């Protein structure tokens, strides 16, 4: 089962870069609900295109949460794929330094943070939706306020995590390969 998925994912590299470009070129500071929700709209369009069921969980002050589900084996606890759509960059940053790519590297607001992880999670969901074969359901949870401590989405995250067999957060490592294990302060 793994080989067709890997082959398909390898064929999707251009589409992955296109989705990353689209996400990076949307200003999405944590306090810019409209911008964070525009990133969500782009992701839900991706899910619609791949016929992946999803729902938007409205949150008043910060970006809404998005939950996408790919069915798996009956009765098994889901695998949770987490990611956040917000960045620390002020609104207007995209105009100063939009997405670019050179020599196999991408640049722009959110590229060294979570936006590539959103692409990874979206394509994992799409691959397993297309090919099936995962023994557990997959749940993608895409929140909008992580950079400020998840004040609005914490309850949503906790509820999904409590149901899950395990959870993955696809936030990248530092350029050194070190990983972040906690927030500052």
What are these model-derived regions, one by one?
Residues 2-109, 129-130:
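Acidic/His- and Gly-rich active-site-bordering loop/insert found
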Residues 74-75, 98-99, 157-159, 184-185:
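Short, hinge-like loop/turn segments at secondary-structure boundaries
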């Amino acid at each position: 089962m793994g080989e067709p998925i890997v082959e398909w994912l390898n064929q999707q590299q251009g589409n992955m870069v296109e989705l990353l470009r689209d996400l990076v070129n949307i200003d999405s500071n944590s306090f810019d609900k409209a911008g964070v929700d525009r990133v969500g709209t782009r992701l839900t369009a991706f899910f619609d295109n791949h016929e992946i069921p999803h729902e938007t969980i409205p949150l008043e002050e910060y970006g809404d949460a998005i939950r996408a589900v790919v069915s798996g084996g009956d009765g098994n606890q889901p695998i949770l794929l987490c990611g956040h759509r917000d960045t620390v960059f002020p609104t207007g940053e995209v105009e100063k330094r939009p997405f670019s790519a050179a020599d196999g590297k991408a640049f722009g607001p959110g590229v060294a943070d979570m936006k590539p992880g959103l692409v990874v999670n979206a394509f994992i969901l799409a691959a397993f939706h297309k090919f099936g074969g995962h023994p557990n359901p997959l749940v993608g949870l895409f929140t909008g306020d992580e950079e400020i401590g998840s004040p609005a989405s914490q309850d949503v995250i906790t509820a999904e995590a409590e149901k899950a067999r395990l959870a993955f957060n696809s936030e990248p490592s530092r350029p050194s390969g070190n990983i972040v294990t906690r927030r500052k302060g």
